[in-house]
């Protein structure tokens, strides 16, 4: 695979107004993508976004670039990332474009693409788009220019799709659910899905103003949700991130239920109903408690690199259907082609309803190990993890933790940091082991 100049693992992302998140680059990106994609069928591309104010600017620039290449743009407005994957398939579009920076603050944004089947673009297509970005723009003949249209019923279509994944003979009637949409793309979707399935819904984070996305709300900051769940006597709280591809949950006591616990609940229910289709893919950061709990059920488990892209790659490689991260990216491949926060939350709610059990009871089956994370800054170019002294200390710690814990040492890809993670059933032992490794890293 050629080295990427513009595309990262999740499209193009950065600070608005700074390259590459500028209107002129978005125009060129729309044109380059259009030139590559225009060689195929419908010549229509879906464009969705989250609620950031910069989305207006970027969608207009992308649309102009696509039109110059002869492709038409269909705008769906603010919609969750997984909704664009679904709608791209159902509209039989050439591709879907999502304008979002996920859980980042409003001043960041990004652009990523889905293929016609709602999956990440193949590497060779991204590479072809990159190659064109360095070429001068041209424009098709006037009669071949693309058009723009707005799809007004996109939200309703996706709401119905989400509801259709919930068991037909089940209902959320009698449940009180607090839904936190991070002032992001799920603000007009998730509350309606839960209401139409019968739940009493309390909304927070559903008043986006273009600037308040992910601000003290949503999956990355659940304190407000925890407070409302406890004060209102709700059964459960759901927190989505800005683009709706991840989920965190809160039980009736205000306890956080993270991606590892959610993944286990879904896996166990799939096993019970005969729909698991293989094993579960986690990541290097998945808690060892998840691995142990799955082992007790004889469910195969493997770890991918951190990032939902790598989880998806492993799922496809193994032919499995379920994977995710502790950050709340949960992929249920027999429901959607990408991580989907609303679908994942409905899977857990269906398990609660089927067994008449609280989220607290379901999550208790995954006793998460205490996890100690320490970032160590280092000077100079040499990676301390290559030091024999650090390797010796790490090997000694691994020996002591054998069977009851693990360590993960990683060099940051963006900063001069070594990330030290130790987890163990014994929290005090995890802390002392982490400190021992940190001292070795600092000394080398």
Swiss-Prot record:
Keywords: Isomerase, Magnesium, Metal-binding, Phosphoprotein. Its EC number is 5.4.2.10. The keyword Phosphoprotein applies. Its cofactor is Mg(2+). Binds 1 Mg(2+) ion per subunit. One of its GO terms (cellular component) is cytosol. CDD domains: GlmM. It is an enzyme of class 5 (isomerase). It catalyses: alpha-D-glucosamine 1-phosphate = D-glucosamine 6-phosphate. One of its GO terms (molecular function) is phosphoglucosamine mutase activity. The keyword RNA-binding does not apply. One of its GO terms (biological process) is peptidoglycan biosynthetic process. The modification Phosphoserine is found at residue 102. The active site is at 102 (phosphoserine intermediate). Catalyzes the conversion of glucosamine-6-phosphate to glucosamine-1-phosphate. Belongs to the phosphohexose mutase family. This is Phosphoglucosamine mutase.
């Amino acid at each position: 695979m050629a080295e990427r100049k513009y595309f990262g693992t999740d499209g193009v992302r950065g600070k608005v107004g700074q390259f590459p998140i500028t209107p002129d680059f978005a125009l060129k990106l729309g044109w380059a993508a259009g030139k590559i994609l225009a060689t195929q069928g419908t010549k229509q591309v879906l464009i969705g976004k989250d609620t950031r104010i910069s989305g207006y600017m970027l969608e207009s620039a992308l649309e102009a670039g696509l039109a110059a290449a002869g492709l038409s743009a269909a705008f769906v407005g603010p919609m969750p990332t997984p909704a664009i994957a679904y709608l791209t398939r159902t509209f039989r579009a050439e591709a879907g474009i999502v304008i979002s920076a996920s859980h980042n603050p409003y001043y960041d944004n990004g652009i990523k693409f889905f293929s016609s089947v709602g999956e990440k673009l193949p590497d060779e297509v991204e590479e072809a788009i990159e190659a064109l970005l360095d070429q001068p723009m041209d424009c098709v003949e006037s009669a071949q220019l693309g058009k723009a249209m707005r799809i007004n019923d996109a939200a309703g279509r996706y709401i119905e799709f989400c509801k259709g994944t919930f068991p037909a003979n089940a209902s959320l009637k009698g449940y009180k659910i607090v839904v936190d949409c991070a002032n992001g793309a799920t603000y007009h979707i998730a509350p309606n899905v839960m209401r139409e399935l019968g739940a009493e819904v309390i909304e927070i984070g559903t008043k986006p103003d273009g600037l308040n996305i992910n601000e003290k709300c949503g999956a990355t900051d659940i304190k407000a949700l925890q407070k409302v769940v406890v004060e209102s006597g709700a059964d459960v709280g759901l927190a989505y991130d800005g683009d709706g591809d991840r989920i965190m949950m809160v039980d009736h006591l205000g306890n956080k239920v993270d991606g590892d616990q959610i993944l286990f609940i879904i896996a166990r229910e799939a096993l019970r109903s005969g729909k698991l289709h293989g094993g579960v893919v986690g990541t290097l950061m998945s808690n060892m408690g998840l691995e142990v709990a799955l082992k007790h059920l004889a469910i195969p488990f493997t770890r991918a690199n951190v990032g939902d892209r790598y989880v998806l790659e492993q799922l496809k490689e193994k032919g499995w259907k379920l994977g995710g991260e502790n950050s709340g990216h949960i992929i249920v491949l027999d429901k959607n082609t990408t991580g989907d926060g609303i679908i994942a939350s409905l899977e857990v709610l269906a398990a609660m309803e089927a067994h008449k059990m609280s989220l607290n009871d379901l999550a208790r089956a995954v006793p998460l190990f205490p996890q100690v994370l320490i970032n160590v800054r280092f000077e100079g170019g040499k990676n301390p993890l290559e030091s024999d002294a650090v390797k010796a200390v790490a090997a000694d710690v691994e020996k002591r933790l054998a069977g009851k814990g693990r360590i993960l040492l990683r060099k940051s890809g963006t900063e001069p940091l070594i990330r030290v993670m130790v987890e163990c059933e014994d929290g005090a032992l995890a802390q002392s082991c982490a400190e021992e490794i940190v001292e070795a890293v600092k000394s080398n």
